[in-house]
Amino acid sequence: MTVVVVTDTSCRLPADLREQWSIRQVPLHILLDGLDLRDGVDEIPDDIHKRHATTAGATPVELSAAYQRALADSGGDGVVAVHISSALSGTFRAAELTAAELGPAVRVIDSRSAAMGVGFAALAAGRAAAAGDELDTVARAAAAAVSRIHAFVAVARLDNLRRSGRISGAKAWLGTALALKPLLSVDDGKLVLVQRVRTVSNATAVMIDRVCQLVGDRPAALAVHHVADPAAANDVAAALAERLPACEPAMVTAMGPVLALHVGAGAVGVCVDVGASPPA
């Protein structure tokens, strides 16, 4: 048998990649009009980012069930679970408590990121598991990926950020932001302000510059995410392809309903695993 990798629906891994590398996921939740909607399971309105909804992490019951199934299917080889940043969701803490109940064969990794910042770490673990590596090695592969990953998001609207409460230090600048558009990064698991500029196109340009500076002439795995703006995401992917010839083209995916609620319509983000091979 082989080690089984589990993640959550913040990861934005396309279904074909999850299937290829046998990566399982548990749902995060959206609470809307008295309903508890499971990301990736229940039907969620396309315009959820416009609704007054809230988000919640994977439940202990869901995590325990997923880990126990994975542990059984691994034949005792173990489980590596890679989850959304502990600073952004209660999922990781619930996962830690669940793993402690199940014993040392379940290892939980804090991605300290979101979207494909989670996905790239899960992919690293999935590849190691597919190669037949033992539990410690698979866990180290995920942890090594965490140390290589950077994530940015250019935000077009401020309403969702004001409601979110997930942005470190946001109260200090949101009230005086006027029409300035923020570029955020994930720093040690927290969403923090990098820079404020006059237009979202300028914020996006700065984001592209930052990514290119990080990568240089090295290979890297790239992902571009968006909230209700695939054209903008495709433009970012094209710009990265032109400026980073050593990298395979970026995958482009929606940011997903949970993250969309926090950053709002028109947001475009980039996740990069510097030095990694592309997720093919």
Swiss-Prot record:
SUPFAM superfamilies: DAK1/DegV-like (SSF82549). Residues 3-274 form the DegV domain. GO terms for cellular component: plasma membrane. Keywords: Lipid-binding. Disulfide bonds: none annotated. PROSITE patterns: DEGV. Hexadecanoate binds at S89. One of its GO terms (molecular function) is lipid binding. Transmembrane segments: none annotated. May bind long-chain fatty acids, such as palmitate, and may play a role in lipid transport or fatty acid metabolism. This is DegV domain-containing protein Rv2417c. It comes from Mycobacterium tuberculosis (strain ATCC 25618 / H37Rv). The lineage of its organism: Bacteria, Bacillati, Actinomycetota, Actinomycetes, Mycobacteriales.
